[in-house]
Amino acid sequence: MKSNTESLAWENLRYDLHSWIKEAISSMGYPTMTPVQASTIPLLSGNKDVVVEAVTGSGKTLSFVIPVLQKISDRLYKPDSDGDLPEPVKRGHMLSIVLSPTRELANQIQSVFNQVLQYLPEDKGTRINTQLLVGSIGNVREDLNQFLTNQPQILIGTPGRILEFLGSSQSIKTSSLEIVILDEADKLLDFSFEKDVINILKKLPKQRRTGLFSATISSAGNTIFRTGMNNPVKVQVKSKNYFGEQSNSPKSLQLSYMMINPELKITTLLTILSKYQYKKAIVYFPTCTSVKHFYQIFNKVYQQESSDEPLKFFSLHGQLNTKSRLKTLDNFTQGDINLYKHILMTTDVAARGIDIPDVDLVIQIDPPTDPNVFLHRCGRTGRANKVGRAIVMLNDNCQEEDYIGFMEVKGIFLTKQDIPTSSATKNLHENFQIKLRQYMLEDRARHELAVKSYVGFIRYYSKHIASSIFRLATLDYLGIAKMYGLLRLPKMPETKYIDNSIMPTDGWLGEIIDMDKYSYADKLQEKTRLENLENDKLKKIQDAKRRKELKIKNEAWSSKSERKENKLDRKEKLKRKREAIEKQIMEEERLNDGGNKDEEDEVVEDWKDMVRKNKKKQKKNNSIQGSFDDL
């Protein structure tokens, strides 16, 4: 009976590869196939569409690189039955497209193709070329000129740029295309890329081979049937964990978790990075701003013990331009591990497919919002049967420990790991917090970045798919604020979840500082701040003056209105009084009807005197009122 190693020898592959490809594989140091390669290469090299789901680090990239090169070699070099060589590929035509969700992964895939193509014999005549098509590197016009000049048979890139490229000129023809590959297919078929990917596939001939590859392809669901595959064969390769349970992670990868107070996360991370034995590590942060924030802190605040092996930090995130990202990734990959321990601080931009040698350790400061990404992050280590370690930090005193059971349902098993509790770790935390506060006080811009990172994390947390576990109502807002180095809590709706008994006065997390005197280190920025501060003060004074004037104006209008109302009341009273007197006189006349005329004349005269007195009194009142009006 053959051993497993013997059965996976390349000579036992159930498909006859071109001799130059066999030589390339041998020269590159791959004595045996991986299970996914042994299953996939014969199918895809033949006439089968495939959907491949295999654990991270299982050799999926070579599983499609070899079939693509095999098919192109057949098209370019394989004689027909009469011994005649095939016709050259027409100008403007391509034979294969490989799609990737990120620029970094596309760049890496091209590197693998080019490594194999180094072994293509010179006497083959027509060379097999590749071209990288990703955003932020050159423009589509430059891509088109390069394509028409070099005539590459293989296009590798991100969906947006490839779709733009295919529609940029009538000189580009897809009718000769033979095979298309979707690497990290579950990501390419989610809402962020699906439209572009489907539009690309519509431009390609229906009689083609299609390969979908991912560690979590099952999450793509029924979307895979929109890719135009014909009776695809599903290749699924899983491993068993140390307990013999079926697992979606490689056996060589040790997965563990820590329950930790968020305030202690950063100093615990630094302790692990200083004390653990590894060559290269990748640390995943939730947002781009948090990567920038902690990258600055680690380089300016953290001081290692002289006995520890020196650390070198690298920053990689989506807000960097493509050239900077590729340069950082190259520096991290090519760095001398004999001089430093290399630590890449990154986001999910480096979570999928990227194969970096010597990565022994992966740490996640927080779990990803999408549980499927968890395995992709961890899979940057423990690749190709090499031992790797992955740790995820979960916030204590809330429901996050339920995440472990949630991941077990998905076939991912984690063991609990204790946090470092030595006196040295406690001293590190105390000293680090003092230095972190001083670092923040030196430059207002640093605190603004810290606040931006904190707010970004809260938004990130609120978008978690497992919302029943990651709940805003149970989050330790104060502990996280201290972790990010905040001096004061920002005003945001989520602070309503903080219990009033622990809510700091006016949001201050330490000694109160005068924000008007809290300055920027940058002189130009500080000058602008002071000018804005002065303008704000003037505006406040002007606003107060306007409010006072408006108040006086409103009061004057109110008094005038009141006087008018009083005058009308007096007139009404006088009218009623006059009517009452007239009524009384008429009543007396009626009773004394027939009396002597002298009495009547006397009554009339008395009435006239009364009217004159009333008029004089009214005139006097008006005169007095007028004098008050002049005041």
From Swiss-Prot:
GO terms for molecular function: ATP binding; ATP hydrolysis activity; RNA binding; RNA helicase activity. Keywords: ATP-binding, Coiled coil, Helicase, Hydrolase, Nucleotide-binding, Nucleus, Ribosome biogenesis, RNA-binding, rRNA processing. Its EC number is 3.6.4.13. Residues 583-597 have a biased composition (Basic and acidic residues). SMART domains: DEXDc (SM00487), DUF4217 (SM01178), HELICc (SM00490). ATP binds at residues 54-61. Its main location: nucleus. Residues 525-594 form a coiled coil. GO terms for biological process: assembly of large subunit precursor of preribosome; maturation of LSU-rRNA. SUPFAM superfamilies: P-loop containing nucleoside triphosphate hydrolases. The keyword Transport does not apply. CDD domains: DEADc_DDX55, SF2_C_DEAD. Residues 41-235 form the Helicase ATP-binding domain. Residues 583-631 are annotated as: Disordered. It catalyses: ATP + H2O = ADP + phosphate + H(+). It is found in: Nucleus, Nucleolus. Residues 265-429 form the Helicase C-terminal domain. GO terms for cellular component: 90S preribosome; nucleolus; nucleoplasm; preribosome, large subunit precursor. It is an enzyme of class 3 (hydrolase). A motif (DEAD box) lies at residues 183-186. The Q motif is unique to and characteristic of the DEAD box family of RNA helicases and controls ATP binding and hydrolysis. ATP-binding RNA helicase involved in the biogenesis of 60S ribosomal subunits. Binds 90S pre-ribosomal particles and dissociates from pre-60S ribosomal particles after processing of 27SB pre-rRNA. Required for the normal formation of 18S rRNA through the processing of pre-rRNAs at sites A0, A1 and A2, and the normal formation of 25S and 5.8S rRNAs through the processing of pre-rRNAs at sites C1 and C2. Belongs to the DEAD box helicase family. DDX55/SPB4 subfamily. Component of pre-60S ribosomal complexes. PANTHER family: RNA HELICASE. This is ATP-dependent rRNA helicase SPB4. It comes from Candida albicans (strain SC5314 / ATCC MYA-2876).
